[in-house]
Amino acid sequence: EAVMESIHKISEKNHHLIYGFPNQYSLPVYIKRLNFELVKHGMKTQIKRTRLTGVFLNFLSNPSIKTIELLRTLDPLKNLLKIESILTRQNKQIQFIRTKKIGDEFDEFWRNERKNIKLLNVRDSKFLNWRYLLNKKDFEVYKIIHKKEFSGFFVILELNDPSRPNFKNLWLVDWFYSQKNKVFFEKEILKVLKNHAQKRNIDNIIIQQSESSPLGIKSNFKNVGKSRPLVIHKNEIGNKYLNQLYPWHFTLGDTDHF
């Protein structure tokens, strides 16, 4: 009842888009009682293994720390990634610079590019500062500098695997860049992720993104599990979104996952 009341108050203003990513148990409540509509394309989860140690451990019961470290040292996928990182150089036309300041250049880029890509949330400096830099989690925000011009950003987060002690995942949380350079940017961002994985002893790179995103990252990642459904409240703004054509771009940064 409290949720229904809050949604009703926000909806009366008519200028708010209200959306959610319910689980299988709460989805019927959103649709039948809260006046939401299910969007055709939800959010998929994709994983790229950067080590095989976890696979080997499935065949061992209660391995010691020394055994785990030995497996890490001998891990063939880890060593292959290390060789790949040495042989693969970053393109000289592009730089990825970590920043703890999000300001006017992000706003200008957002104003220029948002008409080309449909997003659930804004990606201006106010949202990005609130979502990432003011968050207690240690998000890393990287500026994309292409031919000396600001050309977008991406955000990563390193987390311990909750189901496996001593294992770490690298999440690609958010990204937004010019669609005309999509293939090039995707290729170079993946190089950065692999280098981070190799240097930081990461076991998996994980991405969550909309199933129909125009900026979708598809290179050698394995889909896991079912997609998370997206629902939108059918107020005035929500109906405008529901009547628009796909595809939309949304990422883990648009959810309450963290």
Where are these predicted regions, by residue range?
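Active-site/acyl-donor-binding loops of N-acyltransferases
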Residues: 17-79, 134, 157-183, 187-258
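A conserved beta-strand-loop-helix scaffold within acyl/acetyltransferase catalytic domains
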Residues: 19, 23-25, 30, 41, ...
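Secondary-structure boundary elements
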Residues: 9-15, 147
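Glycine-rich acyl-CoA binding loop
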Residues: 1-11, 182-190
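A generic secondary-structure signal
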Residues: 6-10, 83, 131, 192-196
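Conserved N-terminal entry element of GNAT/NAT acetyltransferase domains
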Residues: 73-104
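Long, charge-rich alpha-helical interaction segments
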Residues: 55, 77-86, 111-115, 119
